[in-house]
């Protein structure tokens, strides 16, 4: 088993979970800042937004998780703040971040669809990296299986939990996001085939479909009325994206890059 603590400095500990999130964040900011000028925005617009949105998104992700696990946290109130042990919900962070984005764009007089188009591939890459935090914390895994011989030994060993090998759903989602990121980056090199909002819509559909399937493999899902909450949200995002694409293309929307 890999120690979930990356290193200690006196009384302070830095967990691998946090390292994965921070590495994903830094790469996401770099990519978004690089793309911003092509969408009539500046790198400062991106950085200023991240400084506001990131801490709020983490809080939102934690609130989302705690809300659906309230039966536990109501009896362990001090654990609500133990975020280093895991327990942040990606959808909670995405919802919070999107709300902050619309407010930010309103006050900065920016086009939120442009911003979301820029953010989509960066977020997808950050998610691909961030999922490895679940690996180090031994969470977000699936059912017990007899063997995992198709995986490298370090993953097999870390996925040996409670006396059994577990389906590495974190890995499936990480790879799914990475593939989606590559598709977007290749597709974005052909802007004539893109309309404003297409990258955002692709992200919602791609991530939503992957999460819908992979969530069904997990054994630690947040539940609502007997159905996994993330599957509810995934279906909703897919429907929203399809409707958005249909309307955008039917109305002959604005090209992805404007001259």
UniProtKB/Swiss-Prot annotation:
- InterPro entries, A to Z: Lgt (IPR001640)
For the biological process aspect of GO, one term held by this record is:
lipoprotein biosynthetic process
Q: Which residues cross the membrane?
A: 12-32, 46-66, 83-103, 109-129, 167-187, 194-214, 226-246
One GO cellular component this record assigns the protein to is: plasma membrane
Q: Does the keyword tRNA processing apply?
A: no
For this UniProt record, give its keywords in alphabetical order, as a comma-separated list: Cell membrane, Membrane, Transferase, Transmembrane, Transmembrane helix
Cellular compartments annotated: Cell membrane
Keyword Secreted annotated: no
As recorded in UniProt, its EC number(s) are 2.5.1.145
Q: Can you tell which superkingdom this protein's organism belongs to?
A: Bacteria
Known pathway? Protein modification; lipoprotein biosynthesis (diacylglyceryl transfer)
How does the record say this protein sits in the membrane?
Answer: Multi-pass membrane protein
Q: Provide any one GO MF term from the record.
A: phosphatidylglycerol-prolipoprotein diacylglyceryl transferase activity
Coiled-coil spans in chain: none
PANTHER family per UniProt: PHOSPHATIDYLGLYCEROL--PROLIPOPROTEIN DIACYLGLYCERYL TRANSFERASE (PTHR30589:SF0), PROLIPOPROTEIN DIACYLGLYCERYL TRANSFERASE (PTHR30589)
> Could you say which protein family the record assigns here?
Belongs to the Lgt family.
Function per UniProt: Catalyzes the transfer of the diacylglyceryl group from phosphatidylglycerol to the sulfhydryl group of the N-terminal cysteine of a prolipoprotein, the first step in the formation of mature lipoproteins.
Protein name, as recorded: Phosphatidylglycerol--prolipoprotein diacylglyceryl transferase
- Organism, as annotated: Streptococcus equi subsp. zooepidemicus (strain MGCS10565)
